[in-house]
Amino acid sequence: MKFYDLMSKSAEDVGLQLSKEQYEKFIDYMKLLQEWNEKINLTAIIDDEEIIKKHFIDSIKAFKRDEFKIASSLIDVGTGAGFPGLPIAIMRADLNVTLLDSLNKRVSFLNTVINRIGASNVTTIHSRAEDGAKDIKLRENFDIATSRAVANMSVLSELCLPYVKVGGSFIALKGPSVDQEIIESTNAIKILGGKILEVCEINIEDTELKHNLVVVKKIDRSPKGYPRRAGLISKNPIK
């Protein structure tokens, strides 16, 4: 229970309670992350405490936004090793969470974690984000699309907003400096049916980490031509 108090306080800060059972799931997740990371590149963060703070607590802090507390469905686009989607799913067993990633090895890792911790509310999809968004079973089918992927807001919006229902939200976990990104992505977000609602600052206890949650409301349907084909999105972002 070495990190229970730290994680419990972080959960309380965003209005949640961390049970001992949930904590044990996080520890199992961490052990599998470290074990698999020796075989495939999942994360550069391998120290126990660093994983707790920079992956688990960072993901849990998303609950500072009430959207994560009331949603029925969520997709994590380009989830990688499962952040933030899987920690969110552990904290809310009643939330249907979909983890989407383009690399089959990462999806295999996620399936192993899901089976180990008994996360029956989580499903995985092996697909590129731009391909998945064309699937009628996925397109405009989620209350929330989220991503912690390393891409600018214009690119992320094109990849994520098509998954969101009208009335839902795209919430990006971004670094400390987002002002210029937001200015440059405002028109792209508008074209894709979104509107920037708020930027919410996140602090991680006992670290110098400062992150931002960029909240985009889906107010209209995304045009059928988006997202565009692979490669074009990052090479030629919507201006």
UniProtKB/Swiss-Prot annotation:
Keyword Cell membrane: no
EC code(s) of this entry: 2.1.1.-
Compartmental location: Cytoplasm
Residue positions binding S-adenosyl-L-methionine: G78, F83, A129, E130, R148
Molecular function GO labels: rRNA (guanine-N7-)-methyltransferase activity
Top EC class for this record: transferase
Record-level GO cellular component terms: cytosol
Keyword annotations: Cytoplasm, Methyltransferase, rRNA processing, S-adenosyl-L-methionine, Transferase
UniProt xrefs under Gene3D superfamilies: Vaccinia Virus protein VP39
Classification via NCBIfam families: rsmG_gidB (TIGR00138)
Function per UniProt: Specifically methylates the N7 position of a guanine in 16S rRNA.
HAMAP family: 16SrRNA_methyltr_G (MF_00074)
UniProt family annotation: Belongs to the methyltransferase superfamily. RNA methyltransferase RsmG family.
Protein name (database record): Ribosomal RNA small subunit methyltransferase G
Organism whose genome encodes this protein: Clostridium beijerinckii (strain ATCC 51743 / NCIMB 8052)
